Curated annotation (Swiss-Prot):
The keyword Transport applies. The chain crosses the membrane at residues 16-36, 347-367, 369-389, 396-416, 440-460, 472-492, 537-557, 863-883, 888-908, 911-931, 968-988, 998-1018. Belongs to the resistance-nodulation-cell division (RND) (TC 2.A.6) family. MdtB subfamily. Part of a tripartite efflux system composed of MdtA, MdtB and MdtC. MdtB forms a heteromultimer with MdtC. It is found in: Cell inner membrane. This is Multidrug resistance protein MdtB. GO terms for molecular function: xenobiotic transmembrane transporter activity. SUPFAM superfamilies: Multidrug efflux transporter AcrB pore domain, PN1, PN2, PC1 and PC2 subdomains, Multidrug efflux transporter AcrB TolC docking domain, DN and DC subdomains, Multidrug efflux transporter AcrB transmembrane domain. Pfam families: ACR_tran. It is a multi-pass membrane protein. Keywords: Cell inner membrane, Cell membrane, Membrane, Transmembrane, Transmembrane helix, Transport. It comes from Shigella boydii serotype 4 (strain Sb227).
Amino acid sequence: MQVLPPSSTGGPSRLFIMRPVATTLLMVAILLAGIIGYRALPVSALPEVDYPTIQVVTLYPGASPDVMTSAVTAPLERQFGQMSGLKQMSSQSSGGASVITLQFQLTLPLDVAEQEVQAAINAATNLLPSDLPNPPVYSKVNPADPPIMTLAVTSTAMPMTQVEDMVETRVAQKISQISGVGLVTLSGGQRPAVRVKLNAQAIAALGLTSETVRTAITGANVNSAKGSLDGPSRAVTLSANDQMQSAEEYRQLIIAYQNGAPIRLGDVATVEQGAENSWLGAWANKEQAIVMNVQRQPGANIISTADSIRQMLPQLTESLPKSVKVTVLSDRTTNIRASVDDTQFELMMAIALVVMIIYLFLRNIPATIIPGVAVPLSLIGTFAVMVFLDFSINNLTLMALTIATGFVVDDAIVVIENISRYIEKGEKPLAAALKGAGEIGFTIISLIFSLIAVLIPLLFMGDIVGRLFREFAITLAVAILISAVVSLTLTPMMCARMLSQESLRKQNRFSRASEKMFDRIIAAYGRGLAKVLNHPWLTLSVALSTLLLSVLLWVFIPKGFFPVQDNGIIQGTLQAPQSSSFANMAQRQRQVADVILQDPAVQSLTSFVGVDGTNPSLNSARLQINLKPLDERDDRVQKVIARLQTAVDKVPGVDLFLQPTQDLTIDTQVSRTQYQFTLQATSLDALSTWVPQLMEKLQQLPQLSDVSSDWQDKGLVAYVNVDRDSASRLGISMADVDNALYSAFGQRLISTIYTQANQYRVVLEHNTEITPGLAALDTIRLTSSDGGVVPLSSIAKVEQRFAPLSINHLDQFPVTTISFNVPDNYSLGDAVQAIMDTEKTLNLPVDITTQFQGSTLAFQSALGSTVWLIVAAVVAMYIVLGILYESFIHPITILSTLPTAGVGALLALMIAGSELDVIAIIGIILLIGIVKKNAIMMIDFALAAEREQGMSPRDAIYQACLLRFRPILMTTLAALLGALPLMLSTGVGAELRRPLGIGMVGGLIVSQVLTLFTTPVIYLLFDRLALWTKSRFARHEEEA
């Protein structure tokens, strides 16, 4: 047993060095907990940071946008506006549909928001139209969030009405019940119904009106309680044939008598089994289909939700006829898994590179094994803590662990290098471990807490960006803390038992060659450092110039919000002239689909035409383009989009707007392009005046592309101008006029057919194929007070006008959204500034307010807080270092290394053509924590040499630089190689990871070169300043 000197206490490491079994078992426990935690952690693309969002949809077939706004949307908005915790309320009122999107504060639980929404709907019920077919329906879903899965249901033998009926009752309901599913929408609109198409000439010839027919149908088809008979011995329930189930039964319905002869419905109308809404259609590739879009609840885990759906699909499809085919056209989790797999591979690559650099420096297998154990142990142990914090394995947490690879090895390297130095001097391994660990303990604590201090401001970032990076910061901090524990426990224990003078002195040809190389490098560094110390003011000017250069680079570098990801899915909006009909739009859509499907990168396509909860008007269509996997196509998504738009430009009469689907969705409205800018006013007239002027100017800006607006005020309207006096003399009310028009042209739902499985509608309309266009209005007949039949044309004139196709509100006021993309040679920051400058030139009136929305608003918020975030990180680190060193001066010396890192990071981003986005800013903040390690290691040893060996400050810092050169170089290269796989990543999701790697690699290279010279110079200058200050105070005290 070795006899230890009294001074060899080993500090906090002593207990673990002396008890190797306990230390080993403790580390095994950390390893097992981490492995169990890894298996229990869910997988997702990004941390779950969705705003609690609820969508409320109300359908009122036949109602104009103006009626939907005043009769449906406005009463609901007034009730919703009184809810607490509401962040933003937007609405879209179009022909027959009202969609209100409610976005709540991040702190409000979604279930609480749901209760408030239900209460508000109940309060507004009495204010809504009495003939509303169905009450408002809410869904816990963000309409702008792309579906997690899209399925197409087709059949070669069955009509689409039967297919939709089966899908709705057998498939969609079951999927809706899966935990995490927020909404299942069926696009294609082929719900079964009995359609009654009146022959206007026939009923007019018989002296009947559409109101007569409607009354007859509603009275003939009822489903109500009839009671029961309760006798002395038995009870009998009453039933009757009050329901009509088929088109044939309705065809035989007697609606009136004339001269004693019955007039049946089939005599004056075409009665057929059809679709409830004939102005809806969906296609999968070129085949008509029922398209099922599955959206998740905000906050639900996308991977587990998609897995549950796939597990249930075989069981659901077995219940369908063999002629019905269910195809999964898109699954966002495929790319998410691929992205996470690529990030995990880069994590393993980073570990391998770090271990390789350790061996290169230590040139000793036992010495390499020690940090080779410490690194994975620290990372794996982090998973156990992540489980307790409800984190997930996602791109950001894996990026944090990848970056942590370079951090966690630093502590082990510093400990090993210091212990090895004492062994090489002749100390016994155990004594060297105790002495070296005790000596380096304070340095390790300084490194750890100063690094964690940098991450603290990230935890206080506001809004969704702060939530997004909270998991990143905490995961990284936990890994760093675990590495500190491992470095002060396991690492010195392993050094005491695995290192020896023989093992350290044992050299092969590679060891000898590398040793000579390092000796030459250290000698050259020593000569260069001596020259630099002789010219301190020149070196100081270089340090100050880096500070100035970092500010200039910060001002001029292109700025963005979040990297545009290639997730293999493109969302598209097809726009046609505002007067386009459903048939015309469907034809144009099929032309565009043919062009898109010819592109070699496209795997499948779904498209939808018609007005529903997501599509506002008949002149627009929604498309989802699913690309082939990244390794099966030559181009990334942005190039594919450019190619598709060029190809579709050849199709006359349509405009196509495309944007890649992103994992992070901040918007609440389905947009044509990536970024949005809104104009809000107190009236639609103000918008109609200023929107065209602003659009004209924005379309001329080179910083913007694909500029479009949702302002569509040229929809054709047939305005029925009723002579109220004439109508009153005949006993005809405006309600009679509206009823007649609605029954003729509104696809009016007049009755319900009840079955055991579902409910179906009876739809009444005029057969416009007999009398098409505006001439159909001449066939409308009304009943006067004396029972006579009066043509509508005798009391009204029809005028053709223009009106908006949809009316949009933001927080209850009219709004229009201008959408835009940013060309490749400009940044989002350039675009935002150009829009703001253009707005100023217009001199908008005070009743017009403008605001960026969605990602652009988040970009402005993040950009505004970035400088303060960096300042907060620097201040936090200064406070921690000041407390640790009990000095106001030494923390400034350490922080003087930061500008060099900023210069390197910003230069690297500019050279690589990357924007300064949120991911890159996080990299710069991390650099603040990394590069100061060099200064800490130098200053710690210089202070110790001054204090213990009585050396002069110059000799102390010179010796410290030479002694710590190798660990400084080793730790910097380890951090650099930890970030290198992120910088060089090319797989799925590489766009998200690359800016972090580029910034860190560039910052580490420049800071490594400069701080090795600037830090000792600044240390000496501040030492002289401290001496001068002390002498001044001493002189004043003597004089006093």
